[in-house]
Amino acid sequence: MSLSTIICIGMAGSGKTTFMQRLNSHLRAEKTPPYVINLDPAVLRVPYGANIDIRDSIKYKKVMENYQLGPNGAIVTSLNLFSTKIDQVIRLVEQKKDKFQNCIIDTPGQIECFVWSASGAIITESFASSFPTVIAYIVDTPRNSSPTTFMSNMLYACSILYKTKLPMIVVFNKTDVCKADFAKEWMTDFESFQAAIKEDQDLNGDNGLGSGYMSSLVNSMSLMLEEFYSQLDVVGVSSFTGDGFDEFMQCVDKKVDEYDQYYKQEREKALNLKKKKEEMRKQKSLNGLMKDLGLNEKSSAAASDNDSIDAISDLEEDANDGLVDRDEDEGVEREYTFPGEERTKGEVNENSAPDLQRRYQEAMQQVGKTASSETAENIAKYIRN
């Protein structure tokens, strides 16, 4: 069985790090210890042993001092620095894939620093292109007892799913404090969610959501997210007691199968399309360069000239084809003979035939004029092209 990657994402205070600790303990109890990676550079202490820890190579406070950044800017910069070595991280994980079945990754609590940053996309894409990857979106169940907060969390989960395009499991954490049954019901029953909105209005009066713009907006969003809910696996867990982690791992196995069946093919299509577009862009740039240099026009003009003429000497040879053959070549018996200079002054013989020399000279002048004219025209055409 190939190694699968679980990327844990959640808002600050959702219990993400505690979830990682309990998941690590659960898998070790099952005799399948995971390969653990910590990507939170600002955490002071992690309650689990990490095989790769971003804090070993990047000092968060030094980044703040050297680059004069605030907390969130330092987290983004730390992730940027770490992402430059992501190929080495992938290589290390690949070397251990025969010893581990799962790789679990903890991310910063400032969720936007990871999800919406370029470094977060690089890290996610690198793992997703090498291993079956699943997103575990951790939700604080007690905080989501309000319909407004619940809807906001679901919209955030939807945006993460759209951004990563990876299988997602919505994990309702802290079920030891508040059961997640109400959330599962809201996701599957629209009327139940409407009743919760009305109840919120009754409890909070004018501050509730039972009427007006907010009520209409929340109802519309719940209808819109109905298709989104159908693609999710939802599980309730308690990081404090350990309840629900068996169900969570079953969901992971299911999502890994979905990754191999659907997401992997879609990702390959997307990569091939991207590669094809890049090749087309390079070819277009090359054609533009050739056009700017004028190489295409010159080559096409030379090709057309080669089809019609090869050289100017060929024109002259073709023009000479119109010359009149000598009488000897034609086998005609000469009608007169003049010795010396008299060859050009003789009289016509007894048959009173036309002066053959005059006819010969006229023919030569006419043929020479025609050949020269054709040669001049062809030369002019060659120069113009």
Swiss-Prot record:
Q: Which residues carry this modification: Phosphoserine?
A: S304, S308, S313, S352
Instruction: Report the principal subcellular site.
Output: cytoplasm
One GO cellular component term, please give it. Answer: cytosol
Instruction: Give the encoding gene's name.
Output: NPA3
Amino acid composition bias (Acidic residues), ranges on this chain:
317-332
Q: What does this protein do?
A: Small GTPase required for proper nuclear import of RNA polymerase II (RNAPII). May act at an RNAP assembly step prior to nuclear import. Promotes sister chromatid separation during anaphase.
Region Disordered, annotated ranges: 317-356
Localization of this protein? Cytoplasm
Similarity comment: Belongs to the GPN-loop GTPase family.
Q: Its Gene Ontology molecular function terms? A: ATP hydrolysis activity; GTP binding; GTPase activity
Cross-referenced InterPro entries, in alphabetical order? Gpn, Gpn1/Npa3/XAB1, P-loop_NTPase
Site residues, Stabilizes the phosphate intermediate? N72
Keywords associated with the record:
Cytoplasm, GTP-binding, Hydrolase, Isopeptide bond, Nucleotide-binding, Phosphoprotein, Ubl conjugation
Q: Which organism is it from?
A: Saccharomyces cerevisiae (strain ATCC 204508 / S288c) (Baker's yeast)
- Processing after translation: Phosphorylated by the cyclin-CDK PCL1-PHO85.
Cysteine-cysteine disulfides: none
Q: What is its EC number?
A: 3.6.5.-
State any further remark. Answer: Present with 15200 molecules/cell in log phase SD medium.
User: Which residues are listed for GTP binding in this entry?
Assistant: G13, S14, G15, K16, T17, T18, N173, K174, T175, D176
Which residues form the Glycyl lysine isopeptide (Lys-Gly) (interchain with G-Cter in ubiquitin) crosslink?
A: K369
- Answer yes or no on keyword Hydrolase: yes
The biased composition feature labelled Basic and acidic residues covers 333-348
GO biological processes: mitotic sister chromatid cohesion; nucleocytoplasmic transport; protein import into nucleus
Name the record gives this protein: GPN-loop GTPase 1
The record's note on quaternary structure and interaction partners says:
Heterodimers with GPN2 or GPN3. Binds to RNA polymerase II (RNAPII) in a GTP-dependent manner. Interacts with nuclear pore protein NUP133 and nuclear export factor CRM1. Interacts with PCL1.
The residue numbers the entry assigns to motif Gly-Pro-Asn (GPN)-loop are 70-72
